[in-house]
């Protein structure tokens, strides 16, 4: 699994999202910016991101992920302050 493949999987699961993936060797940093996260706490957001990845995690193709799942407004604010 490479970052391009993972990006495509996440874009299919979150078609309206801005998706950014970096990493290699099974360890990836994920940023998914989508307003469907509005009103959701961090754990449900992470669960939504893990859902399309579970089979890849179970098979070992994806070993570890760091997830940043946020709304467009949260991303705008984070970008302004260098987060």
Swiss-Prot record:
Name of a matching Pfam family: BolA
Gene3D superfamilies (UniProt xref): BolA-like
Transmembrane segments annotated in the record for this chain: none
Homology family: Belongs to the BolA/IbaG family.
Protein name: Uncharacterized protein in rpoN-murA intergenic region
């Amino acid at each position: 699994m490479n970052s391009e493949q993972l990006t495509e999987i996440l874009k299919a699961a979150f078609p309206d999202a801005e998706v950014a993936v970096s990493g290699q060797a099974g360890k990836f940093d994920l940023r998914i910016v989508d307003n469907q996260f509005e009103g959701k706490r961090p754990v449900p957001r992470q669960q939504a991101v893990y859902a399309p990845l579970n089979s890849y995690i179970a098979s070992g193709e994806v070993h570890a992920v760091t997830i940043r799942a946020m709304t467009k407004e949260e991303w705008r604010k984070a970008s302004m302050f260098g987060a």
